[in-house]
Amino acid sequence: MGNDSVSYEYGDYSDLSDRPVDCLDGACLAIDPLRVAPLPLYAAIFLVGVPGNAMVAWVAGKVARRRVGATWLLHLAVADLLCCLSLPILAVPIARGGHWPYGAVGCRALPSIILLTMYASVLLLAALSADLCFLALGPAWWSTVQRACGVQVACGAAWTLALLLTVPSAIYRRLHQEHFPARLQCVVDYGGSSSTENAVTAIRFLFGFLGPLVAVASCHSALLCWAARRCRPLGTAIVVGFFVCWAPYHLLGLVLTVAAPNSALLARALRAEPLIVGLALAHSCLNPMLFLYFGRAQLRRSLPAACHWALRESQGQDESVDSKKSTSHDLVSEMEV
């Protein structure tokens, strides 16, 4: 794509001339249903994700020092909460027809923060799945002390890698003035370098989707084989939810990279971009919904009780030797994330 091309990241809502615009009567109609459709979705994600992740973060924060597994859920809930809190900021350019109101600094910072939280959530989920797998398989070297240290290191590594994945967003973003219709856009400009764009897309696809997907699917598959006699609906829901939310987003990135400039394929992909981004954002409210649904027996008592159930299920063997004997303390009984 050319200098004014946009990538599949947040805040990019530029139009191509893939549909007629009638300005003969002095009123240009530039409202595209596909571009305003994400607004109700963003509202639903915000209303569900903010209180849900806030509750999980609050409960996890209270017990994180005593329970190693709570650290995972604390970091995961914080990442998802920050992502959900950013939705009103993300919705404003959509509601204003693609006009960016936050200036040049906001153009570089705000989309990068959103990307940071989303990638951190994905990488933390993959690392948590690996931790659960280690606990279930029970390697001798994975003791409680080593696990506590390993969890802290893994959380830091997940945030660091997520930060590195967002660096191109901050480097290559700029404001672009359009004149028809008149609006200021926040776009990603690779300066016409297709090699740079291809490299960024490939790295994000591998480290932001394919790698975590393989890790999550492999670890939960191993857990299924390890305890084949029990039903594992939540583990399946985690893998399916991850794939459904993130696969379209990264496939769209590949399409935007390989599509020819001014092609019909590129135009359709850009029109669908806000809705597909919304689907990826929906993953930020998925985990609390899964906790509450599969912990609905405890939810009848109270909302914090359901969160405590999710935390207890993430502890595994470091809680007690009796954990393997009790279904209420069995890590693999529901493979909570």
Curated annotation (Swiss-Prot):
Membrane as a keyword of this entry, yes or no, is: yes
Please give the CDD domains that the UniProt record associates with this protein. 7tmA_C5aR
Q: Which domain of life is it from?
A: Eukaryota
Record's Gene Ontology CC terms? apical part of cell; basal plasma membrane; plasma membrane
Compartments reported by the entry: Cell membrane
On the Extracellular side, which residues?
1-38, 96-114, 173-202, 261-274
Write down the glycosylated positions.
N3
Q: In which tissues is it expressed?
A: Frontal cortex, hippocampus, hypothalamus, pons and liver.
Any Pfam family matching the protein: 7tm_1
InterPro entries, sorted: Anphylx_rcpt_C3a/C5a1-2, Formyl_rcpt-rel, GPCR_Rhodpsn, GPCR_Rhodpsn_7TM
Report a single Gene Ontology molecular function. G protein-coupled receptor activity
User: What's the stated role of this polypeptide?
Assistant: Receptor for the chemotactic and inflammatory C3a, C4a and C5a anaphylatoxin peptides and also for their dearginated forms ASP/C3adesArg, C4adesArg and C5adesArg respectively. Couples weakly to G(i)-mediated signaling pathways.
**Which family would the database say this protein is a member of?**
Belongs to the G-protein coupled receptor 1 family.
* PANTHER family for the chain: C5A ANAPHYLATOXIN CHEMOTACTIC RECEPTOR 2, CHEMOTACTIC RECEPTOR
Can you say what this protein is called? C5a anaphylatoxin chemotactic receptor 2
